Amino acid sequence: MQMLDLLIKNGRVIDPESHTDAQRHIGVTNGKISVIEEIWGSKLQGIQEIDATGLIVSPGFIDLHSHGQDIENYRIQAMDGVTTALELEIGTADVDEWYDIRKNKTPINYGVSSGHIPARISVMEVGFSLIPSKDAAHRSAKEAELKNILETIRVGLKRGGLAVGFGLQYTPAASRIEIIEAFKIAKEFSAPCHVHIRGMGNPPDKGNKLGAIESIQEVIANATITGAALHIVHISSVGLSVTEDLLEIVENANLNGLDITTECYPYSAGMTLIESAIFDEGWQ
C-alpha cells in the first residue's frame, strides 16, 4: 500500500458539498487529498499522522465580512478554521495598496472590495477614516464628485477588487441614483454588491431613516434594475421582529430570478463607531 504523506485519523469529517458528516480517515499526497476512507478496517498509513479524535475536519471557512485585516487577526482566524478572510463591506479606495501591504505576509488568503464608502471619503473629505462622519456621510455628491466616486470604484474592480462594497447606513446622503450607478459598474464587471442597508430596525426610525423592510426593498430594486448580484450584509439583530419577513422577501426575489444572498452575525447585538451617521440626531 502506498505510504501517504499525511494521514489525518479518526476526525469527524464535515463537507457541505458532499453532505458528509461522519468519522473518517483523510489521506494527503503531494499537498492534495488523495483518499477519504471509513475508519473501520482501514490500513492507511502516513509518513506523518495526526490523530483528530474528537475534532472536526472540514474545508476552510471563508469569512465574507472581516474587518480585522491585519496579521494578528489573520492568525487568530486561522486557529478558528478560517482560511480566507475578505473585507467586502467597507472595502478600500486603493486596491493596489491594500493588496501590496499584505503580499507574502499572511497565513491565510485575503481579498477586498472596491468600496463605495472609502471612494466617497477619498473624493469628499480630507484625510482618512474608516467610517465617514463629515461630508462623505451627510452631503450629496456634486456632479464632478459623483463622477470621481464612480471612477474610483471602477478602477478598484479593474485592479482586482472582488465586489463593490456599500455601507448605506453610514452614507445617508448618498442618493438612490448614486447607488444605482455604482450597482451598474458592479454588473459591468460581473462583481457582486455587498451592501449594509440604510436601515436595520423595525418599525422605521423617526425622521428620514428607513426600517429594514424598506431598506431591503431598495437594494433588491437596485439588483432588479441593473442585474447585479446582491449580498445583503446581515439581517440585523435590531430587526428581529421582522426577520421572517425579510427572509421571505429575499427567498421570493430569488424565486423570481434574482441572485441574492444574506447572512446574520452570531450575536444579539451589533457594534460600530460612535462618530458614524448611525448616531445622528434622533438615533434613539
Residue ranges and their predicted role:
Residues 146, 155-216:
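Divalent metal-binding pocket/active-site signature
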Residues 52, 56, 72-165, 192, ...:
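Divalent-metal coordination cores built from histidine and acidic residues
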Residues 1-7, 12-59:
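Histidine-rich, glycine-flanked metal-binding segment
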Residues 102, 106, 118, 125-130, ...:
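Polyanionic/metal-chelating signatures
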Residues 60-67:
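Metallo-beta-lactamase
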Residues 67-69, 90-91, 115-119, 169-171, ...:
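Active-site beta-loop-alpha junctions enriched in small/polar residues
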Residues 11, 31, 54, 65, ...:
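Divalent metal-coordination and catalytic microenvironments
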Residues 74, 95, 175-178, 203-220, ...:
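Histidine/acidic-residue-rich catalytic or RNA/ligand-binding cores of hydrolases
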